[in-house]
Amino acid sequence: MAEDKTKPSELDQGKYDADDNVKIICLGDSAVGKSKLMERFLMDGFQPQQLSTYALTLYKHTATVDGKTILVDFWDTAGQERFQSMHASYYHKAHACIMVFDIQRKVTYRNLSTWYTELREFRPEIPCIVVANKIDDINVTQKSFNFAKKFSLPLYFVSAADGTNVVKLFNDAIRLAVSYKQNSQDFMDEIFQELENFSLEQEEEDVPDQEQSSSIETPSEEVASPHS
């Protein structure tokens, strides 16, 4: 018997069961451990989806924040970062960013400025966490990293190898993303919402008069567009 192609997967079904959803992106140079951090956090429960068309890996996760079920999409660069720039669609409607550098490779720390500049070009207001990965020597946590201080960004010392601070990092990132989405003042969000509203208005204008008159006779509830 042929498989029913229309049946939603468990991951897709999560969209309907969740109270809300957020998108969290990861930035940083190649081989700083972004994917390893996500896999360490999600462990056996993760189901990565390779989206080669967009040169990214998508990880889906369900979290509970303040009693609500949140569907989280973690976006990983999947090698696209080797070009030192990401496609604009990568940033589209992101609610938080995790920016990673390898504490043992100074060049990855210096490149944070480039990644941060690009992030703010597309997402001026979303919360961003700076992550120092691969802390084999605990003494490195005593070092001062001016980049995070300069931009008033939280700095986490983590290890994908042994799991140090990984769970806290991602749980905090999820909470920041949810809080941002609920209280967003991002100008780009307003622009996207205006464009979506404009498209809806255009569609209504294109409806034939007969259909419009029949729709007027049928009462319907006004549904507010969710804030993204």
UniProtKB/Swiss-Prot annotation:
Disulfide bonds: none annotated. GO terms for cellular component: endomembrane system. Keywords: GTP-binding, Nucleotide-binding. Expressed in the testis. SMART domains: RAB, RAN, RAS, RHO. InterPro entries: P-loop_NTPase (IPR027417), RabL2 (IPR041835), Small_GTP-bd (IPR005225), Small_GTPase (IPR001806). Belongs to the small GTPase superfamily. Rab family. This is Rab-like protein 2A. It comes from Homo sapiens. The lineage of its organism: Eukaryota, Metazoa, Chordata, Craniata, Vertebrata.
